[in-house]
């Protein structure tokens, strides 16, 4: 069933990109709900590649952990669009390596003292980007290695640290998201 849905999605989306655009400005969908505002810029490069830089203002959004975070996140990713699915410009399936740095201060739950979290992560992600007229939708999932001084919550406004079934690992970073944007 999943294979059928993927094939149908690919067939429908093949004719959607009417023009080829080389630039996009995107906002991470629902980033405000997780406590930050994320804006990114993507530029098409030769040989089915693109480069993307994203910046995030931590604290410009809903404070879901009630710890008053304030800081920033920077990330760079380099997309490699897959040959068989590449449709030109900003559309198609891709894989990408990412480098992320997150730095912010927050109120610790136990002491309420301002505490600093500084984390970096190197991720491998895969996703699909679709353009329709001037609208771009980009969704991905990935994981990789994290390092630095983690926050109590394990959430670093660009990736989350492994916390499954009560097992924490401060060196495994996970990331997924959806971005919406404008092509030009």
What role is predicted for each listed range?
Residues 1-20, 184:
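Cleavable N-terminal export/targeting peptides
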Residues 22-24, 34-36, 71-75, 119-123, ...:
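Transmembrane beta-barrel architecture of outer-membrane proteins
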Residues 29-33, 55-61, 80, 99-105, ...:
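Transmembrane beta-strands of outer-membrane beta-barrel pores
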Residues 42-44, 79-85, 127-131, 181-183:
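Structural signature of outer-membrane beta-barrel channels/translocons
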Residues 57-69, 101-120, 149-169:
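Flexible, solvent-exposed loop segments that connect beta-strands
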